[in-house]
Amino acid sequence: MPGLFAAKKLKKNRQNFKWKDVDYKRKALRLDVKADPLEGAPQARGIVIEKVGIEAKQPNSAIRKCVRVQLIKNGKQLTAFAPGDGAIGFIDEHDEVMIEGIGGPSGRSMGDIPGVRWKVSKVNNVALSEMVSGKIEKPVR
C-alpha cells in the first residue's frame, strides 16, 4: 500500500496512464474534429460534382446511388448517399445540397455502403425526403 500522503503521486500516475488509452487520446487532442471534413459541424452545404454508383458489400448485391460533393466552406470533396427510392433523380450536377452524417457507429459508414459517411438531406433548400414522397416538387433555380 502507498503511504498516507501519497495521493498526489497516485493521482499524477493515473493522469499519465490516461494517455495510453487510444480513445482518451483521440478525444483530448480533438483528432476526430481535425480530420472531419465538416470540421465538427453537424451539417454542411456543398455543390454536386457528379453522380456515382457504389457497389454494396457482400452478401448484398446492389449499386447504392451516391453523389460526389464539394463543400462550400473548405473545398473538400466527399461522397454522400442519396437515401430513398428514386432520390438520385431529384439530384442534378451543380445542385446545392445539404449533407449530414449517415448515422453509423462512431461517426463511421453505415450498413453495406463502404466508405460513405454522409447522406444528402436537402437539395436546393428543399428536403429530399419530401420530394421522394411526392409532397413537394423540386424548385427550378
From Swiss-Prot:
Biological processes annotated in GO: translation
Entry-linked SUPFAM superfamilies: Nucleic acid-binding proteins (SSF50249)
Annotated keywords: Ribonucleoprotein, Ribosomal protein, RNA-binding, rRNA-binding
Domain of life: Archaea
Keyword Glycosyltransferase (UniProt): no
Similarity annotation: Belongs to the universal ribosomal protein uS12 family.
Function: With S4 and S5 plays an important role in translational accuracy. Located at the interface of the 30S and 50S subunits.
Record protein name field: Small ribosomal subunit protein uS12
Organism encoding this protein: Methanobrevibacter smithii (strain ATCC 35061 / DSM 861 / OCM 144 / PS)
Gene transcribed to yield this protein: rps12
